[in-house]
Design a protein with these regions (language model features):
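Membrane-proximal, glycine/serine-rich, low-complexity loop/turn segments characteristic
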Residues: 21, 33, 59-61, 82-94, ...
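Surface-exposed extracellular loop regions of Gram-negative outer-membrane beta-barrel proteins
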Residues: 214-235, 327, 337-360, 371-380, ...
Length: 875
């Protein structure tokens, strides 16, 4: 670090803060000296000091961090026991104090108390009363969540509770936009929040709980009563050097029947309100069945790039939720995005077969427009019947221009590439659920999807840059155009019945089918001449019938699940008078053991066998020009790929103290669809086949967390190994990739002292095949400091990474300093902020990749230094 005295200052400050604290710990027991798990203990300071709270673990242990020389009124409570009150006078040193609670002879269902308990745990719901943890200076939900015990928020807005990721965010029990946490934590004002509920094993439908397993964790934000009938929110506006501007309104109106939300973002800085993750969440998230389709989506390819040198970003999101009556509710949202960005990438490539080097500079301009929407109806005619219907739609338009400057073996070539993409998607979904009795519940799902993509790429060059087997007409100006069109219609029907045999045995039956109709057309032409061997007109249909039986058994505190699925698959392909068909019958087993050792310890074992089928493009019989130097040829004989997946994970969580999260994952891919490379100098002809060599990958990680009342420390180690094979010019190439990651982080959450958020990681990669070996190291340092002094808030962030590639001896260091100063007078609706990003004005980042036939180093230019002055008005 350039200024080590700053770190010394914070270390000294932290040491002084620790020295002013003492620790009281012990056990909470009943009259038979048996531990009480989940008992609440609160310590209220009578003068200066901070309220302390803890919940006893499965052994009855508790820990309180108290301010030295302060008297506390202590309350210890547990459901069904008499609340005990104690006074701790002038606490001066660490002590061990045990508390014994007497059983309440009245056995009340609820203990009536005069104060709000900061944290209340009831089965799978944890409730935080936020006033007990905040000081009123927090601006957004994000700052509130950081102060709650067991809750973490990263820089991107991801929220985890007790080490598990929050997947759905609700406001007053209604989903906020798509349910993703990022929009909520960065936009909902802190002063409207009354309490926060964290719901594990979350289900939209209450009577399905206990039947369908849910890995979802929901966070419900309850608003204060005086905020439910008024408009609230804030508006940010700012100007900066080099004509920078920022306008960010976030306006909300909530009422008992109808809620409205609007979030806008208009700027030409490096700030993005809608990212790749937001789009994937809108599209239903990632799973094995749609992973390939999502990754290859044109929208994903552009949203994935977050490094640009210029940007004009326009974003608007509108959300409405209306309860027409007790039976029918309607919700909808619209999201509009317009992005114009410029970026530059410099590539150094080593083609391993011929040991030829290439330098390629790409100057890219993107104009992207995206419109997303959803309308949903939820109908509950009676308590045990629920019908949900929604329609989602998406319209995308992308115009991309790339100027390429290429140095191949000291030969300079310049050419341009223009891409036009238009995409339309519609998805309709209907789910009906009926509980007939305590023992029988049924579910029916019908799903329709339609997707159309029109894609064209135009290469303009003065030199023939294309593979030799394309009969290019050599002339002064070469114009090559590729057009493709993809249409997909799909419907899914599934019927499921849940049969509860008794309290410990469940039996579930599932039957359904899936139909896909895919049409793909493509051609390649120079001027008005079409190359016949690059014309494709494929109609690909596939029909799947499946049925499964699932047995679930409760064994002590563990749930054992075994499922056997039968799948019949049939496809037909017709492409330019070439007919082919394929049929398979499969049995796919699945086993899971979910053991709740205690309410804080959990062990999960999973094994399942799944499969994926080849995509439409992989089944074409002619060629596609993927890129100017890359030809793809399909294979009509491809079969399915099988995935054996085994995992074992353990969680031992404590609100304060040590928490452990070890896990191991192993995956084997058999009969994998793998690309065969036939290379000629730098040109690749790629053909997919099913290979008999398994693709194996192993990942182990171990995360250790230590939680203290005012700080948290985390250490993570992760190792990944993958072994796979490809074919280059009919030669099998085996690759072995190893990756080692170590990360340490430290974060404080003091009220009236500087807070530090520190993270350091070291990544070592060892990628080897028979042609090349690449060893690289990447170090990342991230330090953020924020401090509140009266009406001022100071915040700074320093990022540093150092990259070294031992194969090329190349090194690169990158550092970025961001800072802000915020001022808001107490009880004033106005706030002002000076914000600076990339203050050191660093230029680029560097990384490398290795494939079976290519080693590449990629230097990416980053957004330049920016200063903006903002005014914020709170409604």
């Amino acid at each position: 670090m350039k200024k080590p005295h700053l770190i010394l200052f914070f270390i000294l400050n932290f040491s002084l803060a620790i020295s002013s604290q003492i620790v009281i710990k012990g056990k909470i027991l009943d009259e038979n000296n048996k531990p009480l798990t989940g008992a609440n203990i609160l310590a209220f300071p009578t003068n200066n000091g901070k309220l302390a709270h803890n919940v006893s673990d499965n052994l009855g242990n508790y820990t309180l961090s108290l301010t030295k020389n302060t008297t506390y009124n202590t309350s210890i409570s547990f459901m069904g026991f008499i609340t005990r009150k104690e006074i701790l006078n002038n606490t001066k040193k660490d002590s061990i104090i045990n508390f014994i609670l007497k059983e309440d002879p009245n056995k009340l269902e609820e203990i009536v108390i005069k104060y709000k308990i900061p944290v209340r745990i009831r089965k799978d719901t944890t409730t935080y009363n936020t006033d007990a943890f905040t000081n009123g200076k927090e601006r957004k939900l994000k700052q509130v969540l950081k102060k709650l015990p067991g809750v973490e928020v990263d820089r991107k807005g991801n929220v985890t509770v007790k080490g598990k990721k929050v997947t759905t965010l609700l406001v007053d029990n209604k989903k906020f936009f798509t349910g993703d946490t990022k929009l909520a934590v960065n936009n909902i004002p802190a002063d409207v929040i009354d309490k926060i509920d964290v719901i594990e094993d979350y289900h939209e439908n209450a009577f399905m709980k206990g039947l369908e397993k849910s890995d979802e964790i929901a966070m419900n934000i309850s608003l204060k009563e005086d905020k439910k009938k008024f408009v609230f929110g804030d508006i940010e506006a700012g100007l900066g050097i080099k004509n920078r501007y920022v306008l960010h309104p976030a306006i909300f109106k909530y009422s008992p029947k109808t809620n409205y939300s609007f979030i806008g973002d208009f700027n030409n800085t490096n700030r993005k309100s809608f990212t790749l993750r937001d789009y994937i969440n809108f599209d239903g998230g990632l799973d094995m069945n749609n992973l390939k389709e999502v990754i290859q989506s044109p929208v994903v390819k552009l949203l994935r790039n977050q490094n640009f040198t210029a940007s004009k970003h326009k974003f608007g999101g509108y959300n409405m939720q209306h309860a027409k009556n007790e039976k029918l509710s309607i919700s909808s949202f619209l999201i509009a995005l317009s992005d114009k960005t410029n970026s530059r990438v410099e590539n150094f490539r080593n083609y391993l077969i011929d040991n030829i080097t290439e330098r390629l500079r790409e100057d890219e301009r993107n104009n992207q427009n995206l419109f997303l929407g959803k309308i949903q109806f939820l109908y509950k005619p009676e308590e045990n019947t629920r019908i949900k219907y929604y329609t989602k739609f998406e319209k995308t338009s992308i115009n991309q221009t790339i100027e390429n400057n290429r140095d191949l073996a000291n030969s300079i070539i310049n050419f341009n590439e223009n891409n036009l993409i238009n995409s339309d998607k519609i998805n309709s979904y209907l789910k009906a659920e009926k509980k007939f009795s305590t023992y029988h519940t049924s579910q029916a799902i019908v799903n329709f999807n339609f997707n159309k993509i029109d894609d064209s790429t135009n290469w303009l060059t003065n030199t023939n840059i294309f593979p030799n087997n394309i009969p290019i007409n050599e002339k002064e100006s070469i114009n090559v155009l590729k057009k493709s069109s993809t249409e997909k219609f799909e419907y899914n029907v599934a019927l499921k019945h849940f049969w509860i045999l008794d309290n410990v045995n469940h039996l579930y039956f599932n039957v359904g089918n899936n139909f896909e109709q895919n049409k793909f057309k493509s051609n390649l032409q120079q001027d008005n001449t079409t190359f016949s061997n690059f014309s494709n007109n494929l109609e690909h249909n596939q029909f799947t019938i499946f049925t499964s039986i699932l047995y679930k058994k409760l064994i002590g505190d563990a749930i054992f699940t075994a499922e056997l699925k039968y799948q019949n698959y049939y496809r037909t392909s017709l492409d330019l008078n070439n007919n082919s068909s394929y049929q398979s019958n499969l049995l796919l087993p699945k086993i899971e053991m979910d053991w709740d050792i205690t309410n804080r310890k959990k062990l999960i074992f999973k094994y399942n066998l799944t499969n994926t089928f080849p995509s439409t493009r992989q089944l074409i019989s002619n060629n596609i020009l993927n890129n100017y130097n890359n030809i793809y040829t399909g294979n009509t004989d491809l079969k399915e790929t099988f995935y054996h997946f085994v995992s074992l994970s353990y969680r031992n969580y404590k609100t304060y103290g040590w928490s452990f999260y070890p896990s191991i994952y192993y995956k084997i891919r058999n009969n994998q669809v793998q690309n065969i490379f036939n290379t000629s100098t730098i040109f690749n002809i790629i053909n997919p086949i099913n290979i008999d060599t398994p693709n194996k990958s192993l990942t182990t990680n171990f995360r250790v967390v230590y939680n203290y009342k005012y700080w948290k420390a985390t250490v993570l180690t992760e190792y990944t190994n993958s072994n796979y094979a490809t074919f280059i010019n009919n030669n099998k190439i085996k690759s072995n990739n190893n990756s080692f990651l170590t990360r340490a982080s430290f974060r404080t959450v003091y009220d009236n002292k500087p807070n530090i958020d520190f993270s350091y990681s070291q990544t070592h990669k060892d990628n080897t095949n028979s042609l090349f070996s690449a060893i690289s190291n990447l170090s990342n340092l991230d330090v953020a400091v924020d401090y509140e002094y009266k009406n001022w808030k100071f915040k700074t962030e320093y990022l540093y990474n150092f990259y070294k590639n031992n194969a090329t001896k190349n090194t690169n260091s990158f550092n970025e300093l961001n800072a802000s100063i915020f001022y808001q007078k107490e009880n004033s609706p106005w706030g002002f902020e000076l914000l600076g990003t990339n203050i050191g004005n660093n230029i680029s980042k560097l990384n490398s990749t290795l494939s079976s036939n290519l080693f590449s180093e990629r230097r990416t230019l980053v957004f330049p230094r920016t200063f903006v002055v903002k005014a914020i008005y709170k409604l």
